[in-house]
Amino acid sequence: MRGFGVHSEVGKLRTVMVCRPSLAHQRLTPANCHDLLFDDVLWVHEAQKDHFDFVLKMQERGVEVLELHDLLGQTLANQQARDFLLDRRITPNVLGSQIAEAMRPWLDEMPAAQLAAFMIGGIAISDLPEVKAKSLMLSALPETDFVIPPIPNTLFQRDPSCWIYGGVTCNPMFWPARRAETLIQRAIYKFHPIFLGGDFQIWWGDSDQPFANASMEGGDVMPIGNGTVLIGMGERTTYQAVGQVAQALFRSKAAKRVVGCLMPKSRAAMHLDTVFSFCDRDVVTLFAEVVDQVRCYSMYPKDDDGTFEIHPDNRPMLDVVAEALDLPQLRTVETGGNSYQAEREQWDDGNNVVALEPGVVVAYDRNTYTNTLLRKAGIEVITIRGSELGRGRGGGHCMTCPIWRDPAY
């Protein structure tokens, strides 16, 4: 029987969602990759092989792996789900009224799997021969222009939603280029047979309202256990969102403490999990240069309506986390090598590992210094190739959205 809920960062991982490299990555070019928030273009064939290996290694450890294209295709077989998604993606505000009117009937008749591929991989003018004839505007645009841009960052399933104890948030993303990812997750959680009627709540974010300055991405969110949630506040996650999530969790008595971790804002440390991740119940890997600068603010419930009080904490982040988990201290594995090598390995996601169970993690093979230190600390490190998958700046933690994970304490 499948369950729902993520109750730690290192308990037995039972169900996870991923997204394989596909059409969206085939459409990345040096000219458009930065607009689509990807640092580089991939050798897609090799990235697909490496991602398949990643999935296989999780499955060999008993993890159920759900794939986004498959889930979305199955979801869009439901007419209500199709309407939900297209009503929000194919609009005059997004496309212009003439293009929206020309495209909608074509998309309404499209097979579900093909529609899913286009919703993730984008729709170019060259994909629209039948529709193009009905729109003067489309006829005037270059064949390579996108009417619906690709969303290649779906490779990093950690961010658009995150499971926190017995529920999930649908995250309003910081950059407009990624916000369509959250809409896809909302459709899946609402309409896919796996989730329909499931025993979980959507804590926050399932709304069409503009979120203004409230943005959150799952790479910043860690339900570490013992009723505590860490939420990084750096480049992508804002205090406006953290406060609302804390209130929603406290209102439902789903958490007893939320720790906001104020981080320096930088591309290299865009999320908390790029500089800090759990490997075992008491072992973390971290990039000390950033983690040593983190300032913590603990939020505790005040009343049943979810209101809370905030307590600044002047202790190092590691002490705050250890105390929240009732541990005397955390054992740490810092990014390996000298200062140059450590900075390179952090950039290559050396600290962005995903735990399959206590003491077992998946990491990129290229981070040899950090992986060696993890093994010396007693961690089993399963490696996958990172030469292509890592070009978008994310490792095993970023590429996975745990849906069901056991407690660890």
Curated annotation (Swiss-Prot):
Gene symbol of the encoding locus: arcA
Gene3D superfamilies (UniProt xref): Arginine deiminase, L-arginine/glycine Amidinotransferase, Chain A
Pathway(s) it belongs to: Amino-acid degradation; L-arginine degradation via ADI pathway; carbamoyl phosphate from L-arginine: step 1/2
Keywords assigned: Arginine metabolism, Cytoplasm, Hydrolase
Reactions it catalyzes: L-arginine + H2O = L-citrulline + NH4(+)
Its EC number(s): 3.5.3.6
Domain of life: Bacteria
Places the protein is found: Cytoplasm
Main location, first listed in the record: cytoplasm
Family in the record: Belongs to the arginine deiminase family.
Residues annotated as the enzyme's active site: C398
Organism (species): Rhizobium etli
The protein, known as: Arginine deiminase
SUPFAM superfamilies in the record: Pentein (SSF55909)
Pfam families in alphabetical order: ADI
PANTHER family cross-referenced by the UniProt entry: ARGININE DEIMINASE
Keyword Cytoplasm attached: yes
One Gene Ontology biological process: arginine catabolic process to ornithine
